[in-house]
Amino acid sequence: MSWVQATLLARGLCRAWGGICRAALPGTSISQVPRQLPRGLHCSAAPHSSEQSLVSSPPEPRQRPTKALVPYEDLFGQAPSGERDKASFLQAVQKFGEHSVRKRGHIDFIYLALRKMREYGVERDLAVYNQLLDIFPKEVFRPRNVIQRIFVHYPRQQECGIAVLEQMESHGVMPNKETEFLLIQIFGRKSYPMLKLLRLKMWFPRFMNINPFPVPRDLSQDPVELATFGLRHMEPDLSARVTIYQVPLPKDSTGAADPPQPHIVGIQSPDQQAALARHNPARPIFVEGPFSLWLRNKCVYYHILRADLLPPEEREVEETPEEWNLYYPMQLDLEYSRSGWDDYEFDINEVEEGPVFAMCMAGAHDQATLAKWIQGLQETNPTLAQIPVVFRLTRATGELHTSSAGLEEPPPPEDHEEDDSRQRQQQGQS
């Protein structure tokens, strides 16, 4: 209770007691005195509570009817043909411009369009990105004075423009003059989207051809051709030979009772073939895998045929003649006047592994499929028939995977890793 309410209540009580005392006469009881309501009190039938206020509350403002938001999802599903291509995507952008002349809600629509670009297959189209930037109102978000340039003028709009440029960067799309002209019209030269554009124009030409082993942008959908390219991409020896041991049969040729026939593609170099011929038949070799290899947004799996590292006493050191040695002389001892602080030796952790004799990619990762690969290798490597082969296989969901928005492969559960390690130990002991 506030002090105003307490003052009014005390004043009313004083007046009430005064009226009762004046009305009381000798010989009359208090019950006969007529009840007089004080002027300061306003009694009601409802019980008084401390939450009720004596001051009247202001009238509630009238609520305007809320307008329903435009369902932007429906704009991308109204294509007459029903196909998700570039034409239907641009048609959805055009419908948004016709529906909202004042460009109201353009930021939400641009964010939605950026998420839908992969579904329509236009994530690498520069004209579509320029069309999205053209949705922004022109000459509205440009800073007019120094204060607006110091602080981020219209930050939400600038973040949306940067999001468009970042998606262009992630897909390797180089902006052009039209992109620069649109950003100048929308945000001005002294803005963060324009700074992002200048960085893209600076670093993209420098990093475009930095990969010494480039991967084509459009990869083949044929699993045999994709496996051949993946094996060639991993094998450093140009004289290595790719062999197709088994071709997958079409679905029409195989019946319901016949098992599917996966493809098997292998690669082996002459040096690997010679090393396998020199291998001791008493020591087993291992088929390990599958191991993942990412080719842009596609993931393929491969297996290797390898052996354990020989102990130091069984290793043979090959001496290279001087006329064949490209690094001759091998040792050159020159004494320079160096102090004790000059240390040119670095600590490098090098792990020596056993030799790898061959690699393959198969449509299935079971032991029966890989046994066919070993049988095919025995035709060119007769000594392989005398060497015991141990299969160390892990679990894999499949060969061909296309990455989604995250471009990352989920890690396997921990319990599967423990089971796989136990199986490897048991197979190694056997």
UniProtKB/Swiss-Prot annotation:
Gene Ontology terms describing biological process: cell surface receptor protein serine/threonine kinase signaling pathway; innate immune response; regulation of oxidoreductase activity; regulation of protein complex stability
Transit peptide: 1-48
Compositional bias segments (type: Polar residues): 47-56
InterPro entries cross-referenced by the UniProt entry: ECIST_C, ECSIT, ECSIT_N
Keywords: Cytoplasm, Immunity, Innate immunity, Isopeptide bond, Mitochondrion, Nucleus, Transit peptide, Ubl conjugation
Keyword Cell cycle: no
Residue ranges, annotated region (Disordered): 41-66, 400-430
Segments traversing the membrane: none
Superkingdom to which the source organism belongs: Eukaryota
Covalent cross-link site, Glycyl lysine isopeptide (Lys-Gly) (interchain with G-Cter in ubiquitin): K372
Function: Adapter protein that plays a role in different signaling pathways including TLRs and IL-1 pathways or innate antiviral induction signaling. Plays a role in the activation of NF-kappa-B by forming a signal complex with TRAF6 and TAK1/MAP3K7 to activate TAK1/MAP3K7 leading to activation of IKKs. Once ubiquitinated, interacts with the dissociated RELA and NFKB1 proteins and translocates to the nucleus where it induces NF-kappa-B-dependent gene expression.
Family: Belongs to the ECSIT family.
Protein name stated in the entry: Evolutionarily conserved signaling intermediate in Toll pathway, mitochondrial
